[in-house]
């Protein structure tokens, strides 16, 4: 059932019931009297409510929704105000929809559809109330003189020079009903000499006599093409002056907007940039709903303005352009009354957003491109959709820059799920892939920055099948990732398969079922250094960061050395990496040997807690804590042995520091080993483990004062 609360003075209170989806919403509004809407939906198992302060307004709404077999449902809601945010309520799954913040606007009402649950939701915007305003009085005065009149509030006017005639609108405080102002009037417009940019028509402000402010004086020259100092004179009535200037232009070539330029409002981002760094776009409804661009100037990122309209049902896309190594060379698109599809082409990639493929019989196609030039800015027309688009071009650099920043490759797969981004690191250390019934359910990655290990978050929702995993050696890196994605019945588009290839000609995978559309992330001479994508109940899309395989680490590593471990090859490989030092050792014993170990390290004065390796038993852990930083481990000795014909396990460990020796953890039996190197201290550990500790090794680094 459709419903519409209408628009009100402001939202006062919001009440929700929910579980994994939103069951109902009920809103109380402020007005002449408080008005409570009907319950939209039905009562769910969980409830929440919040009340806004008198000077607090809802400025944005973020929602998630999904399509079930019989209906669409809202799964999560987050409300943002001018002071804080409330939520999320429900579970973030499915596609994201939003009512974004609009300058000077508040969300003053809601509308949507509901039955037993909340199916859809949209909003009404209205201006945020301000203090009393009005038009200042019209005064009689000279130039910047004062005027008296009757008006409400505060008026603003500017004027320069003197003249006799009708004064400008005043700014200030005066007498009169509602606040008649005395202040600065709008001065005359006259004929004068001005400084301008390029060649154009200028407005002169000066001294004059007459009604409407015509006079003679000094004015500002016109704005034209190029930058320079313009000198000229002009005579104008009602604000028109003519100026002539000379100067050197910026060199940007403006190609006219292509599309339907009769609809929407003109917009122009200008051309005072070095390049484009990010593209935002969305499709839905009749075509491309909006575009937005981020630019860079002198190394500083400048965020552009959204052109078009964000709507409740949208399919947002974001494309990162890795300036200065990557730059836009052309734009292709097709349209009817509004833009239906746009392709942004760089020297490295093609990024596309479209609602329909190009249809020659009905659509008009265009290309914006200039030989040996790149795009540094955009302009066009837009209303509820993007009507047309044009571009500014400048010559490409005569030299090709050496890649200095990682390349971010666009995620492949579906458009639903929440955006996630691990960023770029020195290397990938470990990969976890969890499978589900319809595809890859979850992924998780560990990275290395210098000697520090960075643990990425779990992306997606793991199933009872858990994770499959593989760990790279210290001198090994991922050279390519292959995969497949497809849309299954009743399920959003998901990644179905992942395959990882390394610098040592190893292949991990395929993880999942090979089915659907194939993709690959690979570039000669580059390695994979990070991942990003979209995920909800499944991994909907995945992308990668690439960096030259000889890239200098983001964080210089300690001058450490990895000593080969002692024990067997059973279990799973683990490696904590190298740190500044060890703060605490924890050893858990089992019936037949060492069950598990974990360590606490120090990195630049920060405590770093390592993971447990192995499987703890009911015996728990014994601990050996160091007096860090004055105390450090200089040696580790132990033994390993095969029990009842099984793979050997580590059955004893003992730690020696520059001050003392720990107790032996376990019972020594079998083959003895020791890790020790003159002038070095132990700064990290590695090995192999399953239900027991099968192998143990160390990282060492020079002892420093």
Curated annotation (Swiss-Prot):
Residues 131-250 have a biased composition (Gly residues). Residues 1-127, 252-395, 406-548, 560-702 form the Jacalin-type lectin domain. One of its GO terms (cellular component) is cytosol. Keywords: Lectin, Repeat. CDD domains: Jacalin. PROSITE patterns: JACALIN_LECTIN (PS51752). Residues 128-271 are annotated as: Disordered. The keyword Cytoplasm does not apply. One of its GO terms (molecular function) is copper ion binding. It comes from the Eukaryota. Belongs to the jacalin lectin family. Component of the PYK10 complex, at least composed of PYK10/BGLU23, BGLU21, BGLU22, JAL22, JAL23, PBP1/JAL30, PBP2/JAL31, JAL32, JAL33, JAL34, JAL35, GLL22 and GLL23. This is Jacalin-related lectin 34. The lineage of its organism: Eukaryota, Viridiplantae, Streptophyta, Embryophyta, Tracheophyta.
